[in-house]
Amino acid sequence: MELGRISAIFRYPVKSMAGELLDVARLSWHGIEGDRRLAFRRLTDKSGFPWLTASKLPQLLLYKPFGLDSNTAERLPTHVRTPDGKEYELRSDELREEVSSRYGSDVELMNLKHGIFDEACISVLSLGTVHGIERESGRDVDRRRFRPNVAIETRSAEPFEEDRWVGRTLMFGEGNSGAALRVTMRDERCVMVNFDPDTAERDSEVMKTVVRMNGNYAGVYGTVVRAGELRVGQVVTLGA
């Protein structure tokens, strides 16, 4: 059954920093290549989730990785532009000190080749869900608030139709040889959706609306069952 087409592809090389909008991406066994391979670890945190995220430091969303390192297999960024417009090498002490100072505690940059994910290696969101939340909340809701890897413009445009995809397969492109993922669970949202991706300002009405409309779920997570290329405009089919 044809669901619609890919509207946008995002990757987030550094966890909780600004994402990159892509026209084409390689979907590997560990998600989109280069996605969330880097993160800042809070050195004083002894929990099982020590990563610094925008829930702890909203301004992290305003740091913009850029450049491409041709010496890395997944072509990770080389530099980061800070909210103040300063530019540092990604792996430099200057950037580490800048982030540590803004957070108020020491951090260090970590590189995990299989990615640093909250639940699963790829997330998918329909534009119908975004538009439904917009209508209900009375806000202009940027799809980037939800930090999806793949945004789909579905034929029905029904909000939260992704919920019905759980346990089924999304296939990308024509035929049966393209990339595919198994939808494993709904995406339960956190305070991240409240932050404007351009200003880091908080608007709690966004998350309240998601809770009211769909029990705090918006979008889905999946695991890769067939690697391949993703491309904006590509047909998306729902399989068994």
Describe these PLM feature segments:
Residues M1-A240:
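Metal-cofactor-dependent catalytic cores
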